[in-house]
Amino acid sequence: MTACIVGWDHLKFGKRVDDDIEDMIVSVATGAMRDAGVEPKDVDAIYLGTFGGGFVNQEFPASLVLQAHEDLRFKPSTHVENACATGSAAIYQGLNHIAAKRGRIVLCVGVEKMTDVTGEVLGGILSKASYLREESASSFAEIFGQITDAYFQKYGDKSDALAMIAAKNHKNGCDNPYAQMQKDLGYDFCRNVSEKNPIVAGPLKRTDCSLVSDGAAAIVLTDVDTALKMDKAVYFRAAQHVQDYLPMSRRTVIDFEGPAEAFSRAFAEAGISIDDLGFAEVHDCFTSAELLSYEAMGLTAKGQGEIAIKEGWTYADGKLPVNRSGGLKSKGHPLGA
């Protein structure tokens, strides 16, 4: 790889009543450039990740980054959308920009404003990330409920493991000042159906589902030569982007083949194995997604993801802490951020 992170900024996720999408973009873009010690005039390109899709009325969001400073005027700014991977996709495009030697300094921003719409409207928007020609679920939770059901049918009921994952991530979120929910709910609450923890879809309870959030984050990327002149830098060992079929009918959904391919390629590019990792952050839009990610990354064999959580491997003090941030489960899930 040829790029480094030299600065960042992050808003606390949650229901941000007083902030619209522009406010959040301007805040984190300004903060990231300040943290990096980069002048706006020196930014070569901007990539903005936001799912959009009807959450807010404002379109053409990439141009809103220019509101952060007049010296960003006329900088190329591109809107990137890739469902739940939108923020990562924006960063990937920033890495490509630097690798292609089109510029030395890139500002990447991720943002979403989700709480201004009703639950019914929200569900309709999120369901558009599924294959509507075949998958007519009324919410994205129903899609993952079907995936979780299929996994249980093949490998047995793993509700205990899902509750352990939920409890772990809620506990981790207590240590994260940017997390939307900073409350240690405990295993018993997450395991049992109750008035405050009802079934949402299939075997998934409320504590198995990530949080609807407003939020934004930004990073500044530079090439290595520029980064060496900075106060701090984090070097990219590898970055991979894969895309699988959208229709669930064209893939074995419980095998998580897309994530497995991405993990495999990234390990190969970096020249490492899973045993070399110190921690991992994986996409836990639902607790079953984290369980499947254990298998996709090679931590366990297929159908045995529960071993990782039941043996304590993925806890904060385990051999491979997973979602030490609290994950989407407690940190919140503003899609683009």
Q: PLM features: residue spans?
A:
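N-terminal leader/propeptide and maturation segments of large enzyme subunits in energy/redox metabolism
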Residues: 138-193
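Conserved active-site "lid/cap" helical segment
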Residues: 1-84, 93, 151-158, 180-190, ...
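Conserved catalytic cysteine-centered active-site region
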Residues: 53-109, 113-143, 182-211, 242-244, ...
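Beta-strand segments within the central parallel beta-sheet cores of soluble alpha/beta enzyme folds
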Residues: 40-50, 76-82, 106-110, 160-167, ...
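Short acidic, glycine/serine/threonine-rich loops at helix termini
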Residues: 17-19, 58-60, 92, 117-123, ...
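Electropositive phosphate-/nucleotide-binding environments in soluble metabolic enzymes
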Residues: 18-26, 59, 88, 138-145, ...
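Short glycine/threonine-rich loop-to-helix capping motif typified by GTGT followed
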Residues: 53-61, 248-252, 284-307, 318, ...
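Condensing-enzyme catalytic core mediating Claisen C-C bond formation in acyl metabolism
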Residues: 1-22, 130, 163-165, 198-261, ...
